[in-house]
Amino acid sequence: MTIRVAINGFGRIGRNVLRAIVESGRTDIEVVAINDLGQVETNAHLLRFDSVHGRFPAKVTSGDDWIDVGRGPIKVTAIRNPAELPWAGVDMAMECTGIFTTKEKAAAHLQNGAKRVLVSAPCDGADRTIVYGVNHATLTADDLVVSNASCTTNCLSPVAKVLHDAIGIAKGFMTTIHSYTGDQPTLDTMHKDLYRARAAALSMIPTSTGAAKAVGLVLPELKGRLDGVSIRVPTPNVSVVDLVFEAARDTTVEEVNAAIEAAACGPLKGVLGFTTEPNVSSDFNHDPHSSVFHMDQTKVMEGRMVRILSWYDNEWGFSNRMADTAVAMGRLL
């Protein structure tokens, strides 16, 4: 069965979702429609040439109301209200605008044909929050509006699951050192978050994140045990989670790393990776994993204080998981 999806919002995530589907060569998911308020010609150009991920791996052509990436024309519309979108024949609406992030707003896609909605962000009131590889098996046919969580929650959750299952996490605090994103300005300007009002490429910028707390939505056994902050840094892509936690029992660096390696080579293969090399952030650009654990950064103090580091391409890894989750939802239709 091939899942027919429509993408609402053709920005960083929307474009990368389409690219991930094409680049992977997968045939279990097909993009049949795109809705974005930008000009079709501009969207096609931004798809063809990407400053972070390079040129699109296939020929991109476009017309007045279509874009073709070598799999046939994809219908393109420019409609503001999701409830008015022509989604007849669409199995899954991928909500990628970053605007319709409550269940009530996202559910508007269901009014005109879409059978399910997958939101590319945390979504208040969603029927379920999914981190693929961690809890996608909990999906049911009754989950109409699903959140794909955030890129940071997708990085942290697989690591947290493995380590909690292996040694137990009593409590912990995460810092994500996160590349700047599209909601940050190139020069100082107005922003409701005064930290994010500052020029993205000129400073390290402390700000908030709900990613650690959101792990509790994915792994209920960790609810209330994790918190965190974000520091935005002057790089355009790739981020890293620095997690310090109190283990439930004494452990060692070797045990922590062995648990991660076993999961990465086993049940979480393709979602969780690991590296033993002296890598830096640019080495993980365009890496499709949700999380790449850095083995030589693991530290254990007095048996129970554990510190780990895990990298993630905050655009590409997340976009690949959007496709994975959409297919998992589609199998329940």
UniProtKB/Swiss-Prot annotation:
Name of the molecule in the record: Glyceraldehyde-3-phosphate dehydrogenase
Subunit structure: Homotetramer.
Residues reported to bind D-glyceraldehyde 3-phosphate: 150-152, 181, 196, 209-210, 232
Binding site for NAD(+): 12-13, 36, 80, 120, 314
Organism: Cereibacter sphaeroides (Rhodobacter sphaeroides)
Matches recorded under CDD domains: GAPDH_I_C (cd18126), GAPDH_I_N (cd05214)
Keywords from the named record: Cytoplasm, Glycolysis, NAD, Nucleotide-binding, Oxidoreductase
Residues annotated as site: Activates thiol group during catalysis: 178
GO cellular component: cytoplasm
Record: active site: 151 (nucleophile)
